[in-house]
Amino acid sequence: MVQVQRRTGGDKGAKGNRASSAPVRSRRMTQDDWSRTHPDDIFSVIEKTLVEDGYKWNGVKPGHCDWGKLKESGAIDNFRGTLEGELGKNCDLTCNAAAVKLDTLQKVKMSSDWTARVGIVLGAPGVGKSTSIKNLLDKFGAKHKMVLCLPFSQLLEGVFAGRLDTFLVDDLFCRSVGYGKYNTMLVDEVTRVHMCEILVLAGHLGVKNVICFGDPAQGLNYKAGSAVNYNFPIIAECYASRRFGKATADLINSSNGGGKPVVGNNEVKDSWTFEELCGKILDMSTVLVATRETQKFLLEDNIESILYSDAHGQTYDVVTIILEDEFDDAAICDPNVRAVLLTRARKGGMIKMGPNIAARFKNGDFNSRGVSKSCTGDTFCEDR
């Protein structure tokens, strides 16, 4: 969508094929020509913080976004169409939020000279993205006028609970916030939100710096609203998890469909067992499922479970993942669904599955039979 630099070849915007998600390497800079000469710049601050936290800093300049780029690329039209689609559904809170955003789109002054620098930070589950964000807010939030935007309410718990500088994206659209009150916007779990939504919000608030954190393995990145389609540079990345151990990392890597390999923490002792559907669930474990159909099926036997999309951003000591051939075959073919299910446990757990899905895990064969209907760039999650 929003092109950071001109390229020859087949890159297209929101209405065509997705642009490359590769970092922009042609504008590489060394530490000498930026962070050392601009130590107080927010991107220098973020570089220092993330490098200390174990991230690889890619040494690329942030991308730039303005109203002209958003309009010319088709991003605004795609976002408007998404919102109008939500209004046509039978819903309550989602429709109210969509109506507010549509109203904002109509009223915002797109002729203004607003421009923002944008960078993407990628990290595997458990690398400490939320902890790094919290550290940035604690140490530099006041000086750089930071605000943290979260796509769904579960993230308001845990390390972000009770913070006065942290809001849901929907809430910031609805609140009366003075233009220019915030200078830097941090976004967690960016793969769960339409990227144009973030950029419109930044323009609406007069934000000058947008830094988005996320795990590409947990987002449906082929959707038009995904951050990868905007070709913003990946400024930092880390794939060494502190949360889970080698067993979980091996399981993820054997079924990730060619994504970036993750590294487990050797100090964490985790394990996984695979069983048929019959039999008991692990004691004291949290039950996770891939579809609402399986969730309803289990509830008939008084087994409560958590849908994978509701577990996004959450962690549990031990999990039991239940996968029914009848309901879950298409969903488990989605690498994003697998990534969420397999990375919620700190100590591993058990996967109980039907014979067809068991064969998929054994053979590493997850050829897609369908598309997940989870939160994507083309639809918003009703529990936001």
From Swiss-Prot:
Residues that bind ATP: 123-130
Example of a GO cellular component annotation carried by this entry: host cell plasmodesma
Keyword Ligase: no
(+)RNA virus helicase ATP-binding domain location: 88-238
InterPro entries with a match to the protein in the record: (+)RNA_virus_helicase_core_dom, P-loop_NTPase
Domain of life: Viruses
Stretches the record annotates as Disordered: 1-36
GO terms, molecular function: ATP binding
Domain (+)RNA virus helicase C-terminal stretches: 239-384
SUPFAM superfamilies in the record: P-loop containing nucleoside triphosphate hydrolases (SSF52540)
Localization in the cell: Host cell junction, Host plasmodesma
Keyword check for Kinase: no
Family: Belongs to the virgaviridae/benyvirus TGB1 movement protein family.
Assembly description: Homooligomer. Interacts with movement protein TGB3.
Role summary: Transports viral genome to neighboring plant cells directly through plasmodesmata, without any budding. The movement protein allows efficient cell to cell propagation, by bypassing the host cell wall barrier. Engages in homologous interactions leading to the formation of a ribonucleoprotein complex containing viral genomic and messenger RNAs (vRNPs). TGBp2 and TGBp3 are necessary for intracellular delivery of TGBp1-containing vRNPs to plasmodesmata.
Descriptive protein name: Movement protein TGB1
Organism the protein comes from: Beet necrotic yellow vein virus (isolate Japan/S)
